[in-house]
């Protein structure tokens, strides 16, 4: 499933150019740069997941099943149980620290499931890069929180939850195919939220005109 990944590779190249060898993913740099790096990583992860979701759907899910599955219990996302904003107005009402806390909770919920994706997808971009970029982004969010909270190191997590692992053998199990389909859908939704929250922060702090993210 290698189609549709050009934009993901482009974002990966940008990140590589911005992270010289031997340096931490998020060194001691200005707030604007920290936030810009976090947005780029969130964009990259969201794009790779969206491409993978589309390719998986085309490969494993019959067309007559796709829309019905999107409304089924299999598509329920754990992230819907936390008080994270789901629309633009609510997002703008939250503080920057709140948006970072929501983002951190969403990212951490995928750390374990993503590691099992190496067995499901031979795509090297997905298998090797997403977990590392999640870890980089987690580190970046902690750096942003320390920057915004006068260097305090707190337990910023909202809830401790994680998604189930992906089924590594969807070819032989229809339930497994649907489970993976649902998990990828949730992953895509959650990363879209994280990207949106970070873009709102960036817009509020560093864009002079009205923020319309």
From Swiss-Prot:
BP GO annotations: animal organ development; growth hormone receptor signaling pathway; positive regulation of growth; positive regulation of receptor signaling pathway via JAK-STAT; response to nutrient levels
Keywords: Disulfide bond, Hormone, Secreted, Signal
One Pfam family in the UniProt entry: Hormone_1
Primary localization class, coarse: secreted
Database matches in InterPro entries: 4_helix_cytokine-like_core, Somatotropin, Somatotropin/Prolactin, Somatotropin_CS
PROSITE patterns given in the database record: SOMATOTROPIN_1, SOMATOTROPIN_2
Annotated Gene Ontology cellular component terms: extracellular space
Signal sequence residues: 1-25
Single annotated GO MF: growth hormone receptor binding
Locations listed in the record: Secreted
Disulphide connectivity of cysteines: 77-186, 203-211
Family according to the record: Belongs to the somatotropin/prolactin family.
PANTHER family linked to this entry: SOMATOTROPIN, SOMATOTROPIN,PROLACTIN
Function recorded in the entry: Growth hormone plays an important role in growth control.
The protein, known as: Somatotropin
Organism per entry: Rhinella marina (Cane toad)
UniProt lineage: Eukaryota, Metazoa, Chordata, Craniata, Vertebrata
Gene: GH
């Amino acid at each position: 499933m290698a189609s549709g990944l050009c934009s993901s590779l482009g974002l990966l190249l940008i990140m590589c150019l911005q992270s010289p060898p031997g340096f931490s993913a998020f060194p001691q740099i200005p707030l604007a740069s920290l936030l810009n790096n976090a947005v780029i990583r969130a964009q990259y992860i969201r794009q790779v997941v969206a491409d993978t979701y589309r390719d998986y759907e085309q490969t494993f899910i019959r067309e007559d099943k796709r829309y019905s599955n999107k409304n089924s219990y299999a598509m329920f996302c754990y992230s819907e149980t936390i008080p994270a904003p789901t629309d633009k107005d609510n997002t703008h009402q939250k503080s920057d620290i709140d948006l970072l806390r929501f983002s951190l909770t969403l990212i951490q919920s995928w750390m374990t499931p993503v590691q099992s994706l190496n067995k499901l997808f031979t795509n090297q971009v997905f298998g090797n890069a997403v977990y590392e970029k999640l870890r980089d982004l987690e580190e970046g969010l902690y750096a942003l929180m320390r920057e915004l909270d006068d260097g305090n190191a707190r337990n910023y997590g909202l809830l401790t939850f994680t998604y189930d692992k992906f089924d590594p053998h969807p070819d032989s199990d229809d339930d497994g195919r649907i489970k993976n389909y649902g998990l990828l859908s949730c992953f895509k939704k959650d990363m879209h939220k994280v990207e949106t929250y970070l873009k709102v922060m960036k817009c509020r702090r560093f864009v002079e005109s009205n923020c319309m993210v």
